């Protein structure tokens, strides 16, 4: 669209009699023509950026889809605690839990038929109370529809990748989502130390999780330490509870 506008401007300026163009206008016309010549390059850079980020997003979705092949049903003891957590959060839809041997961090996949993936090692490394806290974090993501918001945010970041403010705002939104779910986990177990030690235990096993999943373990050590400091030093912020898009 911008290329069309500048092309029309160029044709209009070319049609003006030379005598009617003052010396003061010529530099501006020259600048506009120079900019119009660069617009195709800007378009090409934008298309390349969108294509690269779209490929990354699709690769993440494909990676998430491939998790189903190796996923295992959770044992009855975990299923029992999971169903109890579902009732606490008022989630009556088709939400499932699966164990996976190749991941080390819990996360949520899916918008309408959500699946909570837990690392296989979490069943033995976490205490029942720690497991409840971790499940509460993931179920809060589902209750808030964070998986959908994350996809929308990723799409916006793909289209407007050239704007630093988009990435800054996106990082803040992801941070707020995790803090909201941390607060839900603390409220569920009523013991910040239990949840903090669960996070530390998961961090010790961490290898990485898909980028388009909803996870509280896919982050740097500094971010994790900041969250743990907040968990141990602050009470849950009730103002964050009702902000599903944050």
Residues of each region from the PLM?
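Membrane-embedded and juxtamembrane structural elements of multi-pass membrane proteins
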Residues: 1-246
């Amino acid at each position: 669209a911008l290329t069309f506008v500048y092309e029309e401007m160029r044709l209009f300026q070319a049609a003006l009699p030379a005598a009617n163009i003052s010396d003061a206008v010529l530099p501006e016309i020259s600048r506009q023509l120079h900019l119009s010549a660069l617009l195709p390059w800007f378009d090409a850079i934008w298309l390349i950026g969108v294509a690269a980020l779209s490929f990354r997003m699709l690769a993440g979705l494909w990676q998430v889809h491939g998790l189903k092949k190796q996923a295992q049903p959770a044992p009855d003891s975990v299923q029992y605690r999971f169903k109890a957590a579902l009732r606490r959060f008022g989630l009556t839809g088709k939400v499932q839990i699966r164990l996976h041997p190749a991941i080390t961090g819990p996360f949520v996949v899916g918008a309408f038929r959500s699946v909570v993936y837990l690392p296989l090692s979490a069943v033995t490394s976490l205490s029942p109370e720690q497991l409840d806290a971790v499940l509460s974090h993931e179920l809060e993501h589902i209750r808030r529809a964070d998986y959908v918001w994350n996809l929308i945010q990723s799409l916006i970041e793909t289209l407007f990748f050239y704007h630093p403010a988009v990435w800054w705002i996106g990082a803040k939104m992801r941070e707020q989502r995790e803090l909201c779910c941390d607060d839900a986990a603390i409220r569920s177990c009523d013991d910040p130390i239990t949840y903090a030690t669960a996070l530390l235990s998961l961090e010790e096993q961490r290898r990485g999780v898909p980028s388009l999943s909803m996870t509280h373990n896919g982050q740097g050590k500094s971010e994790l330490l900041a969250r743990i400091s907040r968990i141990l030093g602050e009470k849950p912020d009730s103002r964050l509870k009702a902000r599903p898009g944050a």
